[in-house]
Every structure is written in C-alpha cells, then in structure tokens.
Amino acid sequence: MEYKKLHSWKLIPEKAIELQKLLSKKLTFKPLSKEINLVAGVDLSFVKDYGLAVIVILDKNMELIKVYHHIEKITFPYIPGLLAFREGPIFLKAWKKVNHNVDVVFFDGHGISHPRSMGIASHMGLWIEQPTIGIAKKILFGNYVEPENKKFSFTYITYKNQKIGIVLRSRENVKPIFISPGNLITLDESLELTKQFITKYKLPEPTRLAHKYSQLLKKQFNEELQ
C-alpha cells in the first residue's frame, strides 16, 4: 500500500519532540465512513540491532488472510515517547508490501494516550491516511480508575478532563488493556471495534496474531544470525 511521506526520519530527539507537537495538530477524529471488511494488526519487535515489523490481515470474521513482514537494521535509539521514530520506518517498509485494502489498522502500542498525542498508532495513521487504533498492555500517559472485574467493563483514560483513551477489561481476572484512537476514528468506535475482535484471549485478534507471528519470525531470524 502507498503512503504519504510526511517528514524525514533523520532527526535528533529534540527535533523529533518538536515534530510530534506539530503533527498532533493534524490528527482527525471522525466516525468511520464505510463498513469494516478487512482489518490489519501490527506488531514490532527487535532482534539484536534489527527491527521486525509484522502486519497481519484479517477479515471481519477474524479469519487470517495474509501475513506480511519486513526486517532491517534500527537507526534510532530507544527513547520512551519517541518509539515511532524507531519503529515507524520499519513498519512503512512492511506496509509498502501490503496489497489488501484494509479498513482499520490495529497497532500494538498507543494512539493519542501519549504525552504529545503521538503514539505509534497516531503517527503512522497520518502517514498511511487510514483509521488506526492503539492497543497496549500498559498505560503510557494519563489517569484512570481500574474497571470492574467483569468482561467488557471499562473506564476512561483522562488528561486535563479530556478523554484520551479507554481501559478495557477484555477478560475476567486478567489485567485490562489500554485502547486509544490513532487517527480518523472516534474513541467510541475504537472501543466497539476492539470488542468485536476479542475472542477468548486478552488481546483483540489483530494484535494478538501479529504478536504471534512476530515471535515466530523473530525466532527464525535469530537462528539465522547465529
């Protein structure tokens, strides 16, 4: 799939932070305009000094259609809050290989529940111009109250009285997941779509399967490096 080139990735951390603040003003949150038929799940992992991006394509019945991946050397250091500069270029190379028209992309990571509203789901949402949702296992930014211990109970992640995400109990007796819109989707739709793709597991199928294949490919690549 094609994408829009927004900026150079060759930035020092201070300039990257400035850029995030500027890009956050370009985010749009609006209802989805078409029925959901295909979705993508994205997971990024690392093997030594290489980054691996995995994109899985699922239909609305959660059937796996295709797995895409790309691996290359990392060019940006690990800095909390700037992970998109480390992971984004690798994801975009994998995205270029995708030949399915997906309706929503789920990222393992955050959307606007980020200090500058620029988690990986938001940042990449601007590049690919597709509705994106961030699904995370840990809070990065904002305040919340723990939801009840019932499946699909939820509370909001807030910052300065603004709702920036949702804390969802996807299963009883497990820690909640943290959902936030990335771009071109509303907070409520981010929640409803996530719920639609949850089965018996904690994570929704798009990011769960992306992580599963990421681990398999990472192991394979790691063996090749030996």
From Swiss-Prot:
Name of the gene encoding the protein in the UniProt record: nfi
Main location: cytoplasm
Family statement: Belongs to the endonuclease V family.
Residues binding Mg(2+), per UniProt: 43, 108
GO annotation, cellular component aspect: cytoplasm
Subcellular location: Cytoplasm
GO biological process: DNA repair
Role description: DNA repair enzyme involved in the repair of deaminated bases. Selectively cleaves double-stranded DNA at the second phosphodiester bond 3' to a deoxyinosine leaving behind the intact lesion on the nicked DNA.
The protein, known as: Endonuclease V
Annotated positions for site Interaction with target DNA: 78
Origin: domain of life: Bacteria
Pfam families registered for this protein in UniProt: Endonuclease_5
Catalytic activity: Endonucleolytic cleavage at apurinic or apyrimidinic sites to products with a 5'-phosphate
Record-linked InterPro entries: Endonuclease-V, Endonuclease_V-like
HAMAP family linked: Endonuclease_5 (MF_00801)
Cofactor needs: Mg(2+)
EC number from the UniProt entry: 3.1.21.7
Enzyme class, spelled out: hydrolase
